[in-house]
Amino acid sequence: MSARVSNNLFESMRDAGDFQPAVSGATLLAAIFCCGVLAGTLLLAGFGILLLYKGNLIFGLPVIVGALLYRPQLGKAPRTVLPRSACPTLYRLADDVAAALGIGPVAGIAITGEFNASFAQVGWRRRRYLYLGLPLWGILQEDEAVALIAHELAHGVNGDPSRRIMVSWAINTLAAWTDALIGGAVTAIFAPVPWSGLVLLCHLLAYEQQKSEYRADYLAARVSGTAASLSLLDKLHHEETFGRIRRQAHTQWGNPDIVSELRRQVMSLPAREMERIRRVQRLADSRLDVSHPPTAHRIAVLQANPTLHPALQLPSVDLEQINRELAPALAALRQQVLTTRRWIVVQ
């Protein structure tokens, strides 16, 4: 999506505050296109069956195998999730936030080593999974932790078209076919076909995806309060700091506990430097990730549409207890850094 369109959307969301989902012409075109992708996969399978019926095993069998291997996927659950019995406080918080948003509890919470968090719905039953990046989680205060979980779970109710079953099918199918075709010397000439379809689909969805991100921010603010959501967005500015710490940890004999080191640097960051980081972010016209508006735009929209009384009135969020429950995951991340660093040194 162009910077001009992104800026127009930002001004509309900031000034009008229209956070209700709506079906646009681009969304309808995307839905029709997704149906075409599914129909094309079914036709390919039918063509393979026809070839087999006529006795052409050489071409028929590969066509059917390809149609089966690259059929529409519904996503996969994370390989490892935190057991509820081991992290009851974290799950209780996630369940409370989900209830405030009007959705069911998550099926599981997975931990990553990234400065990020995400939400996924997988399988025919669309089971919900929450992914929490330990580096980001490690620098949050109690209200910011609530805002983070609320924002991610809000992706289940914010009307994002890319999370609908048919759209997910089409995106995964086109991506799989592109990867499969581009790897062969002969088939590579056909790779631009599914790749072009993927680019077109992403272009059709970009506007509503960014609008859905604003809606997720707004829904999260209704749960945790605008102040908490703004503070959380401010913490996202430390992604570059984390990247530098991680690179140093993997190549130098520094602190392998990248979460603690990030927390220390964030806490000791001078106000002047933090303001410089904010100013750089505000000057950015757009981001490479077309599904997310610039952080500065998200902050401005929330400031223009404040929620003074959050829906979730928790007596207290025992963040220390949650972090104690996450201690084994932190230890595993530290060991992963040490293992990678030793491998680099040996090489």
Predicted regions and their residues:
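Cytosolic-facing loops and C-terminal tails of multi-pass membrane proteins
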Residues: 1-37, 41, 186-200, 209, ...
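Membrane-interface, cytosolic juxtamembrane amphipathic helix immediately N-terminal to a transmembrane helix
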Residues: 6-30, 136-139, 144-168, 213, ...
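Fold-level signature of zinc-dependent metallopeptidase catalytic domains
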Residues: 15-19, 55-64, 68-76
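Hydrophobic alpha-helical transmembrane segments
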Residues: 40-64, 184-190
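Peri-catalytic and regulatory segments of divalent metal-dependent proteins
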Residues: 67-169
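Secretory-pathway/luminal and periplasmic proteins that interact with or process carbohydrate-rich
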Residues: 118, 175-180, 240-246
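Post-HEXXH active-site segment of zinc metalloproteases
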Residues: 158-192, 230-237
